[in-house]
Amino acid sequence: MSFISVLRLPIALFLFAIGLTHAYAQGESASIIQVKLLRESSIMAPVAGEVINVGSLNKNVELMVYPLNDDYYEFTFGNGRGLIDKDDLEPVQKSKKVLGLELADLQKLNQNLITTRTTVLYNHPKAKSGVFGELSENLRYPILGRLKGDDGVLWYEINVGDDVKYVRADDCELDNGIPVLTYHHVLKDDENRLFRNTSTTTSDTAFDAQMGYLKSAGYRTLSLAQLEGYLNNSVNLPAKAVVLTFDDGLKSVYRYAYPILKKYGQQATAFIISSRVKHNPQPWDANSLQFMSISEIKQIQDVFDIQSHTHFLHRYSDDKRPVLLSRTEHNIQLDFERSARVLKPFNPKVLYVSYPFGGYNDKAIEAARLAGYRLAVTTVRGKVKPGDNPYTLKRLYVLRTDSIDAMAERIANNRSDVKPMAVRQ
């Protein structure tokens, strides 16, 4: 959540957004109350750290809520909690139907639905079922199961307020994962003489256009901590979400990428080769690969999260393969740990690593885990999905020569390679 967003929130909603709520603090011992809505009510929830409107619930529907404060109750919503105005509710005696009974038979499937428009929530998997409420567009929501109704319509089962509700499959999309974009070097076209045919070098104008597209299309740039929460099914995120990563820690990132990201209000991760951090800034030279200095890394930290690209392992061995692949697990672990120590003045929580040149093996995976890293990214192409191995995460490239339409197609949720789910009849 940005500082500006925090200023706009009452203190109760700010505490709610960061998870410091009464029910969470009390855990399972928190009192749970069954309530009925006196009128249609808007609902809010933290999505990527910002409390936003996420839908509405209809008059007379019932749900289970937890005490929060004098103004709000909270309730189960997706991978977290939602928020509803106390004035819109009244406690009721437990109805003949015990809410939450069906949930015991259902578990999260490591699959989400995506709302591309306002999406109706039904009480039962029937076309003429009563309507419980609506979900707003641009949400990811965990699916508990799917089934076919008597009329052959496919339905998704989800948990709202500790009860099973139903969404028609043709009212939403299946989540195909979050794109993690990879960048390295940024130059102006008129100064790029040596790296024009290098796929890892983009132009400042192309990068500006790409970041402008993300902004205008409504994409939210995520931190790796939020991506970790997505993998663990512990956070609510928008449907339009992307992670931006920069490998190496080149000076061109400070010179060109940083001001562009700042202009569009984006955040990104810089994977730094810790042994190449300079003590003092170097005079700019577009014809060489220069690395950021201590002061330059500090300046970009309002936009960039500083993470590891190893210490001495970013090089090739004599056989032209990443040197990491020829090292023992112990030596890899020592390098990973050293990199985290060197980067600690910039970030006390160096928890994520990018394998040099995308090269990794079982030894590198285990070394990353033992060194205390919680995610590791590769250069294998694809999106990140719940259930993926956190130490072999895929990424995508957007090239200098790619059109904005090509980029939009690459990051959109429009592919069909999602894992099939069992259907209950």
Label each region the model flagged.
Residues N53-K86, E134-A169:
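SH3/SH3-like beta-barrel superfamily modules
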Residues I43-P46, E74, Y122-H124, K188-R193, ...:
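Short, solvent-exposed loop/turn elements at domain surfaces
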Residues P10-G19:
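Bacterial N-terminal signal peptides
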Residues T116, D150, D163-A241, D402, ...:
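N-terminal pre-catalytic segment of deacetylase/amide-hydrolase enzymes
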Residues N176-T201, A239-V242, Y256, K262-N361, ...:
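Metal-dependent polysaccharide deacetylase catalytic core of the NodB/CE4 family, i.e.
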Residues Q26-S31, T76-K108, E157-V186:
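Boundary regions of SH3-family modules and the immediately adjacent low-complexity/disordered segments
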Residues M1-P10:
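Bacterial N-terminal signal peptides that target proteins for export
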